[in-house]
């Protein structure tokens, strides 16, 4: 069963139907103000499709990691006029306001996701209801199938059709991702989910060649399965971020006081050997931007070669490495990027990460490169340097995209109907 063969929202009869859409409105908030509405804007096409077709929308999402209460505790709280599981920092109320402005129509906010039957029963075609944070109830992410089902049953009673547009949580077996479609006996992908599935199917299936994977971030241990799985599919592997120093130490270079996972040196050696056997070209940093402390300075030290001096830590890839990595991306027809090249949040160490984003944006724009950013920090960096709009696909799911690249299946995708 390939990734892309899932029923689409376009194949659903939506007229006069109450449509449950699991969206991902897990947006950053600062004192109740949304600082980046990208995830809300990404969900608009599916919502607008339902409204245009004469249906109404019941939207479900999580936000953050609230403590949550059990359904039994919620019932008790409700009887005394309380709001179950409520946490000010995790309420979706500001999202309802932002969504209303983006849609130019009222959005009704239901302050208790499991006590919204009354609100939902009064809906007419064209209406939009946003339920409060589904994680205010522990059953949403419970390890017990029965508990997840109990919550899903109530939510499923609010609608006729289930659409999943929350790729960011597709790796989670939860009441709203897998419970509802199982109870309703059907489920289809929204436009965002469809786009995610389609791009990952391409890169993991039969992508235009050569294919380069750019992998960064702090720990080798976080990327072991990804590196192992991708090695069977790629032509080039560019390694950056703190994980690169474990690979350099494994090859005998001095890394000063840079971060290193001693327990992963053997894995690094075996991966390099495997890559050689498979004729995958692994490229490691050939120079570094360093300092004696983990802090921003005006003139950090730039090394001459791979070796990092005693008492120094590398915090970004150097100019010669940037040039080499950019040239390699320029030779390729497909590129997938997961993890920053350095501590890009600090200006002196942001050049490497931003250069990768720019090389991918330019390659896509000028040479038709198929470029994919696997969510998380890399997506944030591309957004920060203004390149996100030029990339073929910036994933909205850090954890979900990582699991796909590791070769795992996603419960929130496999539960959806197969394409007829």
From Swiss-Prot:
One of its GO terms (biological process) is gluconeogenesis. The keyword Cell division does not apply. ATP binds at residues 218, 223, 242, 314, 345, 377-378. CDP binds at residues 217, 222, 241, 339, 344. InterPro entries: Pgk_euglenozoa, Phosphoglycerate_kinase, Phosphoglycerate_kinase_CS, Phosphoglycerate_kinase_N, Phosphoglycerate_kinase_sf. Pfam families: PGK (PF00162). Coiled coil: none annotated. Its EC number is 2.7.2.3. (2R)-3-phosphoglycerate binds at residues 23-26, 39, 61-62, 64-65, 135, 171-172, 219. The keyword Repressor does not apply. Its main location: cytoplasm. Keywords: ATP-binding, Cytoplasm, Glycolysis, Kinase, Magnesium, Metal-binding, Nucleotide-binding, Transferase. It is an enzyme of class 2 (transferase). Transmembrane segments: none annotated. GO terms for molecular function: ADP binding; ATP binding; metal ion binding; phosphoglycerate kinase activity. It is found in: Cytoplasm. ADP binds at residues 217-218, 223, 241, 314, 338, 344-345, 377-378. PANTHER family: PHOSPHOGLYCERATE KINASE, PHOSPHOGLYCERATE KINASE 1, CHLOROPLASTIC-RELATED. Belongs to the phosphoglycerate kinase family. This is Phosphoglycerate kinase, cytosolic. It comes from Trypanosoma brucei brucei.
